[in-house]
Amino acid sequence: MKFAVYTKWYWKNGVPTPAELQANMNKAGSGDTTAEDVIWWKIDENHHQSLIIYPSEKIAEEELGKRQVKREKSRADNNIELVEEFMGPIMSRLTEL
């Protein structure tokens, strides 16, 4: 069963432009994951949210250490704070109907 990790982040200096966010994602080594997808979106001037979709809970758990290291670096580099995080199995998905 696919597994999702949702997060919300606070940017003290404001959320960067889409191009800057894409550059941050590329810099963070997005290719260094087995996630099926990583999606970031802006919700206001100082917050963005993200969704990571993994093939399974086991794989999400195996990548937890890598995620934590990347988050610590991102916090230091971008002056951001994790506001909330939720994880769980994906119960339904339109693309799989």
Regions found by a protein language model. Give the residues of each.
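Short S/T/G/P-rich N-terminal loop/turn motif that feeds into the first structured element of a domain
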Residues: 1-49, 53-69, 76-97
